[in-house]
């Protein structure tokens, strides 16, 4: 599949993602918005991750049936779709959580502290671990393919030098893509943290001035929700 023109591969992926995108709207209403606020971010992540997986499977099936690629050749495509889907699903889940935070801040109703805690440290750990695993798997696949490719090259100095530069550019491109995905995730999560911190500090400032009527709405079911519930 490495010999496939990028335009052709992009067209196949575009059609596969467009097919699942058509069904996303109704599925969001049925699977995500029909649930209570506390479950919506998790449902959003699961839905978008599975939709991305379906798109990757559709593209892989097309490559195997129509272009007669072997299963092992489409494995890298499927893993790439899974990695992209993981970061995309995290971003949409954070966006869903941000919408819930805005809605909760506007409602300003009395709420009980969350009984089931979804720890922030655990979510950080799982996200970081999964990111490292995906990055490692992609690098292993790239290096394995490049080793096979280098073994079949002419052993002249010019050929080896050109091959080394090609491998270096490939690894650099992968690292840049991963960096962009991680930075986007950090920015998205920072927006949520800013909302939670600003609301908490605003109420605490009013308390320091003697105003005890302020309340911190419970917008999440993590440590911030516990703090808000007892403030």
Name each region found by the language model.
Residues 1, 58-71, 146-149:
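Juxtamembrane "helix-exit" motif on the non-cytosolic side of transmembrane helices
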Residues 19-35, 91-106, 186-205:
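Cytoplasmic juxtamembrane amphipathic helix immediately C-terminal to a transmembrane segment
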Residues 31-46, 97-133:
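Positive-inside N-terminal membrane-insertion signal
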Residues 127, 139, 178-194:
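Cytosolic-side ends of inner-membrane transmembrane helices, especially those
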Residues 191-206, 211-231:
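HAMP signal relay modules and closely related sensory coiled-coil linkers
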């Amino acid at each position: 599949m490495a010999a496939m023109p990028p335009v052709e591969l992009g067209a196949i992926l575009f059609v596969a993602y467009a097919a699942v995108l058509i069904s996303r709207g109704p599925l969001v209403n049925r699977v995500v918005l029909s649930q209570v606020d506390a479950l919506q971010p998790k449902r959003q992540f699961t839905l978008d991750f599975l939709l991305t997986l379906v798109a990757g499977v559709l593209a892989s099936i097309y490559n195997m049936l129509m272009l007669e690629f072997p299963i092992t050749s489409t494995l890298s495509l499927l893993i790439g779709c899974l990695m992209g889907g993981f970061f995309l699903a995290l971003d949409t889940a954070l966006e869903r959580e941000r919408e819930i935070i805005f809605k909760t801040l506007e409602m300003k109703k009395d709420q009980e502290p969350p009984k089931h805690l979804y720890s922030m440290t655990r979510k950080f750990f799982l996200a970081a671990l999964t990111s490292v695993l995906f990055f490692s798997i992609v690098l292993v696949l790239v290096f394995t393919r490049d080793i096979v490719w280098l073994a079949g090259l002419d052993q002249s100095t010019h050929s080896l030098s050109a091959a080394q530069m090609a491998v270096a550019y490939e690894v650099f491109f992968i690292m840049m893509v991963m960096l962009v995905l991680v930075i986007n995730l950090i920015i998205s999560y920072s927006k949520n943290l800013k909302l939670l911190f600003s609301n908490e500090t605003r109420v605490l400032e009013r308390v320091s001035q003697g105003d005890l009527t302020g309340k911190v709405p419970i917008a999440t079911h993590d440590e911030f929700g516990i703090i808000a519930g007892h403030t």
